[in-house]
A protein has these predicted regions:
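Short Lys/Arg-enriched helix C-cap and helix-to-coil transition segments
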Residues: 539-549
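Short, acidic/hydrophobic/Gly-rich beta-strand patch recurrent on exposed beta strands
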Residues: 22-27, 156-161, 225-227, 367
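Extended interfacial segments that mediate partner engagement and assembly in macromolecular machines
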Residues: 59-71, 77-198, 233
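Rossmann-like S-adenosyl-L-methionine
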Residues: 2-10, 18, 231-503, 508-509
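Carbohydrate-binding surface patches
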Residues: 212-216, 222-232
Length: 574
């Protein structure tokens, strides 16, 4: 029988999607079911059908999974924030680790055996609740029945239901800090008593759109920012009196956003009481066991600052990235997509020089301020797209006859991953190590494939759970210049007795220096050897032979081949 919409189907959930939907198969279709977890046997109702897959709504759990737990939040099924709260936390970690593993194999093209060998255990949370230092609550209204039976409107705050803009009223999200509830409920009282209207997305009328709350976990300082569809809040003095009395609140501001847009924050921020920014401190931990090192970096955070929302896991994430960078104090490092300089300032504590690049000008201003506040003078920041700033730097340095290389390049791109031009320039600069911090393992796998095809070897992979009870996972990866066992080792000293006349005219080092100066390219001894053979220059019998008969050798790219030939002509070798 042909399946159709509204049909009931029996499913056993065998896997989960990246968005946390349960995946099961029926009648040749793969179905995605919200609120179902691995191991559940369910009855679901078909809601949408495509050619080979479809979506279904959970109707009944026939046999619950051994990994199913009682979710502590009564709103988790309605709210779009927690997709997998009903799954045991250990199983959540396994699911996320498998997600990274499978993407590296399926998209990256790496062998499962290889990834299994280099992948380190996922870094989970000690407490997977109350971890968010920032929350943006939409403000709306709903009809309620009064004591006399009449209907009236009341203002509400909460979160949007999944894939909608319908507000689920909830002032105590279990992922947020406990102070959120008192602040929200106090703010709603202020709105009710002073007849402050809530913004209506359909009519674009009403004043209050969102309430942003941020907390510095280390400092205890709390910032409250009201996003309004106007220029001023009524009775600001009353709001200040109410909120300033809440423990920890040190900053009250207004964000003006009159645009008909889904963007939450407006560009203009006005502080109405207290500080313009709050402070927080991120500790630098030992990257091996996350023990204390006694070192840290302090950050000033504004309502618009990009700052990781889980500070406890951020310490582990960035300390791991710092450990992978392998800094000894003499390195030049580039930090691409640097935000307010969180990773940059970590790196600057261990490197000789750090260059940070970020497209958001306000973030770069914050980065520079944070560097000054921490007494860091070896970090320099640039406003612009990574795919424009890095290539521009490279081309200018090469044109001036200077080395355009870096010892380490760190990237922490958005979900779409690194731009192709950015990856191309990284390959041209040939850093000794590349550290990739990713928030999307699918685009990570795609980019790693490009970097490894360009001469890098994947050395370490480790997932970090930044967002418990959601389908999202961060990943830190280390790549180094390719020197696996099945590639040849090259000696720099030549046996003069075995040299041909052509070989004696220039050493490999001289050829490399010429190519770097004239073409801005770094070439390996292997590439030079391959081009020399093509040009009829006979090498010594034992030179550049692989260690084993089935060893793979990378072939010289066309641009580097032309540059090497130019060098050979320059030295009169061809």
């Amino acid at each position: 029988m042909q399946l159709k919409k509204n049909d009931l189907i029996n499913l056993t959930i065998e896997d989960m999607s990246s968005e946390g939907e349960g995946i099961g198969k029926a009648d040749g279709f793969t179905f995605f079911v919200k609120d179902a977890i691995i191991g559940d046997s369910i009855v679901a109702r078909v809601t949408k059908l495509k050619k080979t897959y479809g979506y279904a709504r959970l109707e009944k759990i026939v046999e619950p999974s051994e990994f199913r737990v009682e979710a502590p939040c009564a709103f988790h099924k309605q709210c779009g924030g927690c997709q997998i709260q009903a799954m045991d936390y250990k199983k959540q970690l396994e699911f996320k680790e498998n997600k990274v593993f499978n993407n590296l194999v399926r998209i990256g093209g790496f062998s499962a055996d290889f990834i299994e060998k280099i992948m380190e255990p996922i870094v989970g949370m000690d407490n997977p609740y109350r971890y968010r230092n920032k929350a943006q609550f939409p403000i709306g209204k709903r009809k309620v029945c009064g004591e006399d039976g009449s209907e009236k409107w009341e203002v509400i705050a909460g979160f949007y239901a999944g894939r909608t803009h319908h507000i689920i009223a909830n002032t105590d999200c279990l992922l947020g800090v406990t102070e959120n509830q008192e602040i929200l409920e106090t703010f709603l009282v202020y709105m009710t008593e002073n007849r402050v209207s809530a913004y209506d997305e359909e009519t674009c009328r009403g004043l209050v759109r969102h309430l942003l709350i941020r907390k510095g976990f280390a400092s205890g300082e709390i910032m409250v920012c009201v996003v309004i569809n106007g220029d001023k809040l009524p009775a600001e003095d009353k709001l200040i009196s109410l909120l300033s009395g809440i423990r920890g609140v040190v900053s009250l501001s207004v964000s003006i956003n009159k645009e008909n847009t889904n963007v939450i924050m407006g560009k203009k921020i006005r502080t109405i009481w207290g500080k313009d920014k709050i402070k927080d401190t991120i500790r630098i931990l030992n990257g091996e066991d996350f023990s204390e090192t006694g070192d840290s970096v302090e950050f000033a955070i504004s309502p618009l600052s990009f700052y990781q929302v889980n500070p406890v896991q951020t310490e582990k994430l960035y300390s791991l990235a710092l450990s992978y960078a392998g800094l000894k104090g003499k390195e030049t490092v580039w930090d691409l997509y640097c935000g307010i300089g969180t990773i940059s300032l970590f790196l600057a504590k261990r490197a000789k020089k750090v260059y940070g690049v970020e497209i958001v000008a306000d973030a770069i201003r914050d980065a520079k301020e944070n560097a000054v506040n921490n007494g860091i003078d070896n970090a320099e920041f640039f406003v612009g797209k990574a795919e424009e700033v890095l290539p521009d730097f490279y081309e200018k340095e090469v044109a001036a006859g200077r080395s355009a290389t870096a010892d380490v390049i760190v990237v922490d791109p958005p979900r779409k991953g690194c731009d192709a031009m950015c990856l191309d320039t990284i390959l041209k600069m040939q850093p000794k190590r590349v550290v990739y911090v990713s928030c999307d393992s699918a685009t990570l796998a795609r980019d790693l494939k490009i970097l490894c095809e360009g001469g890098y070897e994947l050395k370490k992979v480790r997932a970090v759970d930044q967002f418990a009870h959601t389908g999202h996972v961060e990943t830190v990866v280390l790549l180094s210049q390719q020197k696996p066992d099945d590639y040849i080792e090259v000696e720099l000293e030549l046996d003069e007795m075995d040299l041909t006349t052509a070989e004696s005219k220039a050493t490999y080092k001289e050829i490399q220096e010429y190519v770097l100066k004239e073409h801005g390219l770094k070439v390996s001894n292997l590439y030079i050897s391959q081009v020399k053979r093509k040009c009829g220059i006979i090498e010594r019998e034992n030179y550049n032979k692989p260690k084993s008969e089935d060893a793979k050798q990378p072939f010289c790219p066309e641009d580097k081949e032309m540059a090497i030939k130019d060098a050979l002509e320059h030295f009169g070798m061809i």
